[in-house]
Amino acid sequence: SDFLNFTGGSQQMMGGGGGGGRVNIQLDGDNTNGVPLNFGGRQNGIMTNYAGGINFNRDLTKKAQLTSSYFYNRIDQDIRQGTDRINFLPNQPSYNFNENSIGSNLNDNHRVNLTLDQKIDSANSIKFTNNITYSESSQRSTTNSETRSNDNTLQNKSERFNTNDQTSFNLNSSALFRHRFAKKGRTLSTNLTLGISETDGKGNLNSTNQFYGNNPRVEELSQRNTQTNSTQSYGGTLTYTEPLGGRKYLEANYSYRTNQNQVERIVYNEKGGASTIDPFLSNIYNSNYIYSRPGVNFRMNRQKYNFAVGVGYQNTQLKGDLITQNAKINRSFENFLPVARFNYDFSNFKHLRFDYETSMQEPSIQQLQPAVINTDPLNISVGNPDLRPGYAHNLSANFTTFNPSKFINFFAFMTAVYTTNAIANSQSVDPTNFVRTSKPVNVRDNLRINGNFNLGVPIKNLNSRFNFGPTFSITNGINLLNDLENRTKQQTVGGTARYNYTFKEILIVDLSANLSRQQTEYDFNQQQNQAFINRTYTAEANLTFLKNYQLNTSYNYYSYNSETTNFSQNIPVLNIGLSRFLLKNNVGELKIGVNNLLDQNLSVNQTATANYLQQTTSNNLGRYFMVSFTYALNKQLNPMGGGRGGRRGGMQMIINN
C-alpha cells in the first residue's frame, strides 16, 4: 500500500455509501421528510419541505472519471414558540424572562458537486473537486417578551417585529496531484484549495421597549440594515513520504493558507421619513488570517499494530482594519502542534485505537466584529476584535469487539478535550433595566469529556436481542458574569436500553427507553444549581399477515421534567400504518397511515447554560394522514436483495397526500 499523506488523506475514501437514489414527490405541505428534528424526535413548527436531485457519473476515458450531482431543497417553516427562562446572577436574586413569538422561515438551497479524477499514468494522477452552493432565505418574526424580578415585579417589556432577507454563494475548489516514485512507498502530493463566500442581506427592526423601576421610560426603534460579507481563501499543502525500510515511513509536509474577510454592516435609523446612519451600530471591518505550518510525521506498521507520531509548527498572523473605528490590528500567534495515533488489532473482530492531536481554535469572523447587534434590544450581542485563538488537546480512545459465533458486540468510545485560552461568553446584566449584553472573551481553560458505550446480546431461546448503551458527558468551563469569573460544571448521564423480538418474518416487536439527566453546578452560588431529566419511551410492532399485508404501529412517550422549576410536560405520540406489497418480488409497497393519532401538537426543549435554565415549547404538526407508494428498483434487478422491514436500497418513489 502507498502511504499518501497518512495523517489524514485517506478520509476522502470513507465517504462512499450504497448506490441508488430517491425521488420524493409531495402533494401536501405537511410532510417533514428530510427536515432536521430536535432532541427526542419532535420537530419545531410546521414545515413544508420539497427536495430533489440528480446524479451524473461517467467514465470519460479509461483513465478519467466524472462524478457530478445537483440537489435542491426548499423548506418553509411556520413556528410559534414560548420561552420561560430563569436567570441567575452572582450574589443577587434570580430574575425571570418570558417570551412568545410567531415566525416564518423560508429557505431555498441549491447545491452542485463536480469531481474529475484523472489518472495520467501509472505514477501520476490529478483530482479536481468543486462544491457550489447558493441559497436564499427570508425570516419574519413578531415577538413579545418581559422580564420580572424575583418578587414578580415587572422590570421591562418589549414588542418587536424583525425581518431578514439574505442571499449567499459559496464555492470550494481543490486540485490534488499525486506522484508515486519508482521506489515503493515514496510519494509526493500537493493539494491547492480555493474558497469564495459572498453573503448579502438586509433587515428591519421595529420595536417598542418599556422600562420600569427607578427610571421608567419608553424607547421606540425603527431601523433597517444592510450587510455584506465577503471571504476569499487560498491555500496549498505539499506532502512528501519517504520509506525507511521495515514498514516504517517518514513524512514531511508544509501547509499555507490565507483567509481574507470584508464585512460591512450599515444600520439606519428611520424617523419622520428620513434615514440617518447609526454609527454606534454600523461597522466596516476587514481582516486577513494567514496560516503557515511545516510538519513532520513518523509511522511504523506491524502485523498487530501501527502507530504514528508527529509535530507541526503553526504560525498564525491576524491583520485587521477597523475602518469605522479608525483602528488597526496586527497580531501573531505561534504554537507547536503534536499528534500521536496508535492502533492495535487483537484479531479480525477486536480492535483498540488511541488518538491524540492538538489544534488551534481561531475565532470566527462574526466573533471578531466589534459591531453591536441589537435585533433583540433586551438581549444585545457585540463582537471582540481582541480575541486570541484557543489551543486544544484532543484525546480519544475506541475499543470494539464482536463475537461472530455468539453475535455479541461491545464498543466503548471516549473523548477528552482540554482547551487553554478558550473562547467563552461574557455576559453583563444591567441591574437597572435587566438588559443583557453578551461578548466573546478568552478564558483560562475548559474541559469536556464524553463517553459512549454499547453492549448487544442475543437471547436465542426467545428469538430476541438486547442492547444497552450508557452515555455520559462532563463539561468544566469558565464564563464571565457581570465581570465575575464563574466556573460551571455540567454533568449529563443517560443512555438507551432496547429489546427486540422477532418471530420469523411475521412479527417484529421493538421496545426501548432513553434517559438523559443533566445537572449544572455553579461556583458563585451553589443554591442556584440546576437539574432536569428528559425521557423517551418507545414501543413498535410490525405484523405481516396474508403474505402481502403488513400492520405497523409505534408509540412514543416523551417526558420532560425540571427538578429546579418543577416544570413537567408529557407528550404521547401514536402512529399506525397498513401496507400492501405489490408487483413481482414485492417491489411495490402501497401504505396508508395516520401519524400522531392522539393529535399532540407540541414539542419541548430544555436547556441549561452558564447562568440560566430555559424551557422552550413549540408548535408541532398534529394528526395527519399519509398515503405513500414505494417502488424498489434494487429488488427488481436483484430479487434476492432487500427484505421487508429494512431499508431498501436503489430507487424509491414516494407520493404523500
Language model features: what each stretch is:
Residues S1-T142, N162-G201, T239-Q262, N297-R299, ...:
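Membrane-proximal, glycine/serine-rich, low-complexity loop/turn segments characteristic
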Residues F3-F6, I79-Y95, Q139-L154, D200-F211, ...:
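Outer-membrane beta-barrel translocator domains and adjoining extracellular loop/strand segments
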Residues G34-G40, P93-N100, T153-F161, N172, ...:
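Extracytoplasmic loops and strand-loop junctions of Gram-negative outer membrane beta-barrel proteins
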Residues N100, S233-G235, V267, T276-N286, ...:
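Outer membrane beta-barrel strand-and-loop segments of large Gram-negative receptors
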Residues L250-L352, D523-N525:
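Signature of Gram-negative outer-membrane beta-barrel scaffolds
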Residues F336-F342, L395, A412, V493-Y501, ...:
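Feature captures outer-membrane beta-barrel proteins of Gram-negative bacteria and organelles
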Residues V509-S579, T607:
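C-terminal beta-barrel architecture of Gram-negative outer-membrane proteins
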